[in-house]
Amino acid sequence: MPRTTAWEARANRAERIVREVRAALPEPVREAAAAVAVRLDRRVPRHWLADGVEPDSLGLFSGPSMRDADASQSDEAPLVSLFLENIFDWCGGDEDAFDEEVERTFLHELGHFLGLEEDDMAPRDLD
């Protein structure tokens, strides 16, 4: 039987956390969030680094938000990307802190899909 790598274990944990967080969202938010895909990367992909995304970013929302008037006309789907090795490093290798930060980062990026700006995140403890 093949062994699970540390990366696979982290990705499995993150998938479970995102699934649980989505299920716990209030109904209207949960319905809206169903349109958002989630991508788990080790680190920030090169093409985003070339676009100016910081290499130590924990997550990123891309695509149209709910505030975009022409969101239904966009060819790009809403996407939350989580950079799991960056999150793990940020948490100093602490597994419990990793779980909490995956949840927090997912909610932060989902907030951008819902139309929240960075200043809107702090009162929700998502900054």
Describe the function of each predicted region.
Residues 1-101, 113, 117-122:
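Active-site rim/adjacent substrate-binding subdomains
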Residues 101-109:
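Short alpha-helical catalytic segment bearing the HExxH-like zincin motif
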Residues 124-127:
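Short hydrophobic/aromatic patches at helix-to-coil boundaries
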